[in-house]
């Protein structure tokens, strides 16, 4: 199924709604178009494609059908192209770049088609999280990521994607992401204490006698 057919099918499926909270899956659909509009232009198209695929997959789940391996192949290919473009881009450094690279490496390793809708749902959520790192500090659906166990395994205990005041972004997340960048694959949660220390060191008087290392 080509991407044009994916878009055509979405026009018939977009009005689907979950009948019961107990049946709810594909939670990223709750984000909706308003949230996508807040994303950077560079990832909006990808985010819309992910939501369309989630809508189609949710309809298949409610009809008792398995997740589509062909649909997953399309989305995986689209995500891979985006990751490749991101890797070679010359855009200015963003404080979440280290996190995006960690998540991107994880996404490249899941080409195998998902066997269950739960697995498909998790993959779509991680992909959307990668998109949402483009507006980290202002994301209104960070709760969806914070409860995703697989995502927490990748990035640690802090997603860095919630709504934060600008001063906190400057004083906390930037030092945190720089600390992650210097350690490579380290989980963000492991570096939180180091980032906190670096921030305090910058703001504290010199020679207070405290040693971290």
From Swiss-Prot:
InterPro entries: EHV_Unk. Induction: Expressed late in the infection cycle. Keywords: Host nucleus, Late protein, Virion, Virion tegument. The keyword Ligase does not apply. It is found in: Virion tegument; Host nucleus matrix. Phosphorylated. GO terms for molecular function: zinc ion binding. Pfam families: Gene66. GO terms for cellular component: host cell nuclear matrix; viral tegument. Belongs to the herpesviridae US10 family. This is Virion protein US10 homolog. The gene is MDV089.
């Amino acid at each position: 199924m080509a991407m044009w057919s994916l878009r055509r099918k979405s026009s018939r499926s977009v009005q689907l709604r979950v009948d019961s909270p107990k049946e709810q899956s594909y939670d990223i659909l709750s984000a909706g178009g308003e949230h996508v509009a807040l994303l950077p232009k560079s990832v909006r198209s990808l985010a819309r494609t992910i939501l369309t695929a989630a809508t189609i997959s949710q309809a298949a789940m409610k009809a008792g059908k398995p997740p589509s391996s062909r649909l997953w192949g399309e989305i995986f290919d689209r995500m891979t192209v985006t990751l490749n473009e991101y890797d070679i881009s010359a855009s200015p450094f963003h404080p979440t770049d280290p996190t995006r690279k960690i998540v991107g490496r994880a996404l490249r390793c899941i080409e195998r088609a998902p066997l269950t809708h739960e697995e498909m749902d998790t993959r779509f959520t991680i992909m959307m999280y990668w998109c949402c790192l483009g507006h980290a500090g202002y994301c209104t659906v960070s709760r969806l990521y914070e409860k995703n166990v697989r995502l927490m395994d990748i990035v640690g205990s802090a997603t860095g994607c919630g709504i934060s005041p600008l001063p906190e972004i400057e004083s906390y997340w930037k030092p945190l992401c720089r600390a992650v960048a210097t350690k490579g694959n380290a989980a963000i949660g492991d570096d939180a204490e180091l980032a906190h220390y670096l921030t305090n060191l910058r703001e504290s008087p010199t020679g207070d006698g405290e040693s971290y290392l």
